[in-house]
Amino acid sequence: MVLTSDHLDKKNIRKIEYKGEDSFSNSMSKLPLQGGMSDSIFMASISDFSNWSRLSSLWPLLYGTSCCFIEFASLIGSRFDFDRYGLVPRSSPRQADLIVTAGTITMKMAPSLIRLYEQMPEPKYVIAMGACTITGGMFSTDSYSTVRGVDKLIPVDIYLPGCPPKPEAIMDAVTKLRKKIARNRFVNRASRPIRTKYFSISHQLNLVPGTCAGKYNWDRENCGTKLAPANFSENCQKFANEHDELKSAI
């Protein structure tokens, strides 16, 4: 996006093609030229300049709740070095524009996740990492405390399946997110609607009788006959009378 002396060469003017605002490219050879311009200025629209600066400096908020976060932690090392993508992990949601949810989301953690997402400034992006985050994973069938998909709580931009995803797949997801940010338009970007908080929704629970609860219910209803027989009170009174007679005789 920076003009250099090579672009101002008259021989290269015919080779340069103009690229509209609907698409974005980091290449410096796709910009229109005007005579007499300096080689130290930017030639870009507001949308392209905003997207270029944002995709080059994503600040993620790491939200790891399970084993998938171990794979993301390996990106910090020298082997993958995610600093070359401009990723700077932040501990405060007010300083982050990307949240990476890695692991199982439980019912108790759902309000905290939504609160963190709402504290992030716009524009903000979400990467759902791992099968447990996307669909609930192995807990999606018979778990009473697992949220079956983080997209039921917050909007998701990139889905990254796997159990767990490899670090290479995580970098590919970051690359795809950068391409998505590059295609956004600043003037037409609509703010996401304010949704009802998760912890304020009244759940509609349907009680279903269990198939193996018959014996338990029968034992519960008849436990009085086993522990307290019908003549239990009479035996207690008889024992008390015998104790009083024995005490008076002594």
UniProtKB/Swiss-Prot annotation:
Recorded catalytic activity of this chain's protein: a plastoquinone + NADH + (n+1) H(+)(in) = a plastoquinol + NAD(+) + n H(+)(out); a plastoquinone + NADPH + (n+1) H(+)(in) = a plastoquinol + NADP(+) + n H(+)(out)
Cofactor binding notes: Binds 1 [4Fe-4S] cluster.
Record: residues binding [4Fe-4S] cluster: C67, C68, C132, C163
Entry keyword set: 4Fe-4S, Chloroplast, Iron, Iron-sulfur, Membrane, Metal-binding, NAD, NADP, Plastid, Plastoquinone, Quinone, Thylakoid, Translocase, Transport
BP GO annotations: aerobic respiration; electron transport coupled proton transport; photosynthesis, light reaction
Pfam families: Oxidored_q6 (PF01058)
Localization per record: Plastid, Chloroplast thylakoid membrane
Membrane association type: Peripheral membrane protein
Gene3D superfamilies assigned: 3.40.50.12280
EC number: 7.1.1.-
Top-level lineage group: Eukaryota
InterPro entries, alphabetized: NADH_UbQ_OxRdtase-like_20kDa, NADH_UQ_OxRdtase_20Kd_su
One Gene Ontology cellular component annotation held by this UniProt entry: respiratory chain complex I
EC top class, as a word: translocase
Signal peptide (from-to): none
Known partners and oligomeric status: NDH is composed of at least 16 different subunits, 5 of which are encoded in the nucleus.
Record-stated family: Belongs to the complex I 20 kDa subunit family.
General function of this protein: NDH shuttles electrons from NAD(P)H:plastoquinone, via FMN and iron-sulfur (Fe-S) centers, to quinones in the photosynthetic chain and possibly in a chloroplast respiratory chain. The immediate electron acceptor for the enzyme in this species is believed to be plastoquinone. Couples the redox reaction to proton translocation, and thus conserves the redox energy in a proton gradient.
HAMAP family: NDH1_NuoB
The protein's name: NAD(P)H-quinone oxidoreductase subunit K, chloroplastic
Organism: Adiantum capillus-veneris
